[in-house]
Structure formats: structure tokens, C-alpha cells
A protein has these predicted regions:
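Short alpha-helical catalytic segment bearing the HExxH-like zincin motif
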Residues: 84-92
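Histidine-centered, transition-metal-coordinating active-site segments
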Residues: 1-83, 97, 101-279, 287, ...
Length: 420
């Protein structure tokens, strides 16, 4: 599925220019992007650890900093409101390495919001950020919760800046399903509409473009429903838990190290314990160059400031917690499997625990049912509060079928990978 589309080169600067043309770029944004508390996110991938396993063939590395910047540009483009834009920029400030993998390891695969808990504390505790906010006449309370701004964030299946930005680069990187031309067409068709609750929401001017976007979005969301994705995130989450228990990594490390640094530490820890030669290791290292994010002096000042709590209540059919005498062997086995796996098995039952790592999980469904301007209405500007809008599924049989197919889809009960 991930090789359906031919490889293509993507220019992320061109993508950002679609989101917000340079002549409309928010003049205050760059100074915030330079903050250590945000620069840390350059070392955190958007795609939840899939950059580090050959099971995926990600076309390029896209960081949480890139995503945060993209969300801010979208919010600014549609609102020109400084507080909302900065709130969008800061919304992922508490994201640990490997992004939503930390939700999986904390038992939150279904909602994937556990990592948001420290956001307000981090924002209020950063002196440099506080100084910039004061210069711009803003307070922490105005930017610490982007959920209060419906253009920035709302609930599925509505469309928001966060959801919009997340799925554009996900589709480009995971399977190449978005072209720049399609992104430009969809994005330039958007406007602000009023939803059923009378709240602002991004929506489409034309039915045809709304259908195109819905189809692409649900196709990418389908990738995230597959057992391949569930297993990858859960396996990496178990590796993180074992590394923390072994004293190799700490909760603070997950908030301060880059993904590359975590991988290098795991490489060093497990390299003498490999039961098989990592034939793909060289290829993975070359791929990892795309993921590298050097820790600058400004990022260094951010280290050791924040920690997180954990709990492990995710339903996982995998090996029982290893005894101390074998924990290193199990960690090495899991890690080498993660770094070399190229396929998994889809099964109705869990396979033997001593040979396989298996998952049986329900995860967050990412789909969209956007607003679209009613066919008897007209809209010519980005402010369409008086224009009648409807949900796409109410007027499009095609979209209704796509959405229902997505919601009813279920992979096999178990996804399993043979352990090395």
C-alpha cells in the first residue's frame, strides 16, 4: 500500500508557501521558532517512530517543529490573530520523542492525548517564551490551550488547522499520495464557515474539492488503522518502557534528547547482544541522516527541565514483563526486530509469545466529514459566516460511502511480527 505512488521530490518550502504566501508571513513568527523549547521539536518526527524501521518507506523526514510551524501558518492565514497563531505554534510543545508512541506506552492509543498534559506547565515555565509573549502583549493563558480556538483545533470529524496540516505531510511522506498541485487546490478552496453549533470551522467552497480532500484524508487515515502501524508504535513503546526500566533512558531523556540520540543510545546498548547481523543497518543509517537534528547550544539549555509520568495499561498481547536477568536480552530482541522488520503477519489469534510480538489494539480513528458550502449559496471571500454550509456526507453519496467504509473497516484481530 505504501508503494502505490511513484517516488516524488517534495519541496517543503513550497508547501509552506502554499499555507501562507511569504508576503503574508506573520512577522513575529521567526523569533518564536528560534526558542530552545520549540527547537527541541526538530528532533521529534511527526510520523511516530516510523522513520526508524524498514517496515515503512517514508519519503522524507518531517518534524514536529515543521508541523507546528505549518499549523501556525494556517491559523494566521485564516484569522490574522496573533494569540491564535502562537497557540497553534505551541500546541505540540510537550511532545516527547517518537510522538504518539508515548501515548501508546501510557495506554492511550484510543484518544492519543496523554502527551498534551504538560503543555501549560512548559509554556508557563519557560522564561524566554514568557519574555516574547510579554513583548507581543500576550499572556500564557491566551496561548497555552489551542483547543479554545476552533480554527486551530476541534473534534473529529471536523476540519481544523492541526488536522489539516497533519494529513498533508503524512500523505506526502508515508505513501506519496498528495501532490503539491492537489494540496494547493484543496487549500485554496478553504474558507471559514459556521458549523451546526454556530462555531467557526474550516470548510470547502466546492463539492468536488471537498470530495477529493475527504478521499485523500480517509485513505491516509486508513494507513494509521492498519496493524502495521499499531504494532510499530506499540513495539517501540515497549522498547522505551524497557529502556527506562533498565536505566538506559529516563522520562527526562524522552523530553530532551532527539530521536536520533535515543536510537544511537539503543544501538550502543544492544549492539553486542544481536542474535543476527543487521544487514539493513547501513541502509537505516543513511535513512537516519534525513532524521538527524543536531542539538544546538540553544537546545542544550532546554535539557533536564521537564519530566513525565507513565502507566502501562495498553492491551498488548506480547511477552510478559521479563525478569531482571533476561531484560537486556528481551530489550535487544525487541529492538533488533523493530530495526529490521519488513513485514508483519495478520492473524485471528495471537501467535506464540516466545516467538512473536503481537498486538490487539483499538486506536484513534482519523477521518474527516468537512463542511462544504451549500450548492445554492455563493462565497467569494475567506469570511463566509453568513453562507449556509452542510456536512459533506449529507450531499455527497461518494463521500458518505468513503466515510462509512473507513469507520467500518477493521484489520485482523492481531498483528504479529517474528522476533529475532
Amino acid at each position: 500500500m505504501l508503494s502505490r505512488y511513484a517516488p516524488a521530490d517534495y519541496d517543503i518550502s513550497e508547501y509552506f508557501n502554499i499555507l501562507c504566501p511569504r508576503d503574508d508571513w506573520p512577522p513575529f513568527l521567526d523569533k518564536y521558532l528560534k526558542l530552545p523549547v520549540l527547537q527541541r521539536l526538530a528532533g521529534v518526527g511527526l510520523l511516530c517512530g516510523t522513520d526508524w524501521t524498514p517496515l515503512y518507506k517514508n519519503r522524507f523526514y518531517y518534524s514536529r517543529l515543521d508541523h507546528s510551524k505549518g499549523v501556525a501558518l494556517i491559523v494566521w492565514h485564516f484569522t490574522h490573530d496573533k494569540a491564535q497563531t502562537i497557540a497553534g505554534l505551541l500546541h505540540d510543545i510537550s511532545t516527547p520523542v517518537f510522538s504518539h508512541v508515548s501515548d501508546f506506552r501510557k495506554g492511550d492509543a484510543l484518544t492519543q492525548t496523554a502527551t498534551e498534559e504538560p503543555t501549560a506547565r512548559i509554556i508557563r515555565g519557560d522564561a524566554e517564551l514568557g519574555r516574547l509573549l510579554a513583548e507581543d502583549g500576550l499572556t500564557a493563558s491566551q496561548v497555552e490551550d489551542y483547543h479554545i480556538y476552533p480554527i486551530a483545533d476541534n473534534e473529529i470529524p471536523q476540519l481544523s488547522a492541526d488536522r489539516l496540516e497533519y494529513m498533508f505531510p503524512s500523505g506526502m511522506a508515508l505513501d506519496g499520495s498528495w501532490t503539491m498541485e492537489e494540496i494547493c487546490r484543496c487549500y485554496n478552496d478553504l474558507t471559514i464557515l459556521k458549523n451546526e453549533e454556530g462555531r467557526d470551522e474550516l470548510g470547502f467552497r466546492s463539492l468536488e474539492v471537498a470530495e477529493l480532500y475527504c478521499e485523500h484524508f480517509c485513505m491516509i487515515g486508513h494507513i494509521l488503522q492498519l496493524n502495521e502501524n499499531k504494532l510499530t508504535l506499540q513495539l517501540l513503546g515497549q522498547i522505551m518502557n524497557m529502556a527506562e526500566k533498565a536505566g538506559l533512558l529516563s522520562e527526562s531523556d524522552f523530553m530532551t534528547l532527539s530521536e536520533r540520540e535515543v536510537i544511537e543510545r539503543l544501538d550502543d546498548y544492544t549492539k553486542h547482544d544481536s542474535h543476527t547481523k543487521l544487514d539493513r543497518h547501513g541502509e537505516l543509517d543513511r535513512h537516519a541522516e534525513l532524521v538527524s537534528a543536531s542539538i544546538t547550544s540553544s537546545e542544550q539549555r532546554f535539557r533536564n527541565k521537564f519530566g513525565m509520568t507513565t502507566s502501562n495499561d495498553v492491551e498488548c498481547h506480547c511477552e510478559a514483563e521479563p525478569k531482571q536477568s533476561t531484560s537486556r536480552d528481551i530489550l535487544s530482541r525487541y529492538y533488533h526486530t523493530f530495526r529490521t522488520m519488513t513485514k508483519i503477519e495478520h492473524t485471528n489469534e495471537a501467535l506464540p509469545e516466545n516467538e512473536y510480538f503481537c498486538v490487539n489494539l483499538k486506536v484513534k480513528q482519523r477521518y474527516i466529514n468537512p463542511l462544504v458550502v451549500a450548492q445554492n449559496s455563493a462565497v467569494v471571500s475567506t469570511d463566509s459566516t453568513n453562507v449556509k454550509s452542510v456536512r459533506l456526507s449529507d450531499i455527497s453519496e461518494k463521500a458518505r460511502s468513503i466515510i462509512e467504509d473507513f469507520k467500518s473497516y477493521s484489520d485482523t484481530p492481531y498483528g504479529c511480527v517474528k522476533l529475532l
